[in-house]
Amino acid sequence: MDLYNYSNQNGTGDVLGGMDSAEILKAMEAGLKTGMQYNNEINNGGGLKVESLDSVLKILGNRMNQLVYYMEMPKHKIDNTVHQYNQLYKYGEEVGIFNAEGETPQETDSQYRRKSIVTKFMGVSGQVTHPGMLAKLAGNMDMYQKEVENKTILLSTIIDTRLVDADSSCVEEQFDGVFRQHMLGINEMDGGTAEGKTSEQLLDGYFNSPAVIDAQGSVLNDNLIQDAANVVVNVYNGYIDRIISNPIVFNNYVKMFHESKRVIVGLAASVTGATMGQSVNDVTTQFGKINIKNDRFFDERKPITAGKGASSAKAPVTPVVGTAIKVNAADTKTNFGNHAGSYGYLVTAKNRYGESAPLNITSAGAKAVAASESVEFGFTAGVGGAFPATCFVVYRTKKNAVLNANTEYFPIFEVPASQMATGYDGAAANCVRDRNRIIAGTRSALVYYNDSQINEYLQFTDTMKMDFAVTSPSKRFAILNYGTPVLYQPAKIVRIVNIGEEGL
């Protein structure tokens, strides 16, 4: 017996009661709307549906195992907010060791350096309302527990990102990231001290050091890795076990080996069922094998556009133009030699909360720069705002980029607000000079040995959850981390800068 065999009461056999078959089938449809869309609406049964909601939450954000640099850096629990350590700087001076018979050898003293590093305080907070905790959620999820997990991952991700580029001279509340500590450490190792040096002297000492290798915008290659390994082992007496960088660096590196993978026509299993592509997991150098480590947040250098707004309501106001942009001819320290062309510049003001909307330095058009020139321009902090700027971020386009609303500008350096009065990198007062020390759109890589004798993340306390007092029908909490990275032997880490892509 089916629907169409039923008879109505008048015996005519017309079960449809004046409705055609299409209408009766329509009445039987479940419909394509969700239950909530039928609210307060006369319907043919679609509103009776039970929602089909997947019990598994789909995660669109990053995973904890992608935070390679932070997760694999050795951790050390400390007992105070200031941690001190000693360095053996020299065994002694190189004195004459050959003596006459019976003569007392020359005396020389070992040299030590005592150093300290300060813990910084990081955290994010979250809140879940009382009804939110009572509601039944997909997969029987505990909303409070999930929010704690989310904020823990968020804080860890931001720490992983800032491990590289944080700078306490620009934002006092930040720790000094690895790049900043590396620059200061190299100046101390090669020049004896970093104290009292101008920004130009620090940058000269750093970028002219063997511990910094310039890729000049090229793709990472075996020659660069080999040179870095040689410096660590034979110049600064270290060991190597890894190279770490952003995944795009190794993505471009592995492409160089695609042509080395041959397909031999006619050879069984050479084409049909063959595994194509290439994967490089480690690199053998003259001084040992090093593992490739990817961290997607390592030296991220996110670009912005000229129309970008402030990143926070507490960000500083936009800076204002000072000295007009110009080029300095015959700059003997410029790195524009292989990168002459036209460039656009933006500047943002920054504090611990975020960055302002950018000031367009080249609103009148891109600035042409010759191979022997550098670029100089001035700006000052904007007037007003409850939260002043503590530093400025300078952005630049890639070479010969067409300037429009969609053009990408990449961060190339930050300048402390307190340093503007004397000029940055040899510039006049309230001006900055761009010598192309960092090429826009490039990344860095570090070659080193990951050991507690080389680097550590000092933890005044482990990452922890602190519950706040309940003063309303909601539960508030904070995820906290008190710590700082430290490079004990910065010279035993080599940084490869300006790693680019084909055609950069």
Located regions from the model:
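Flexible, glycine/threonine- and acidic-rich loop/arm segments that mediate assembly and lattice contacts
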Residues: 1-313, 342, 367-377, 429, ...
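Disordered, low-complexity "stalk" and linker segments at domain junctions of extracellular
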Residues: 304-443
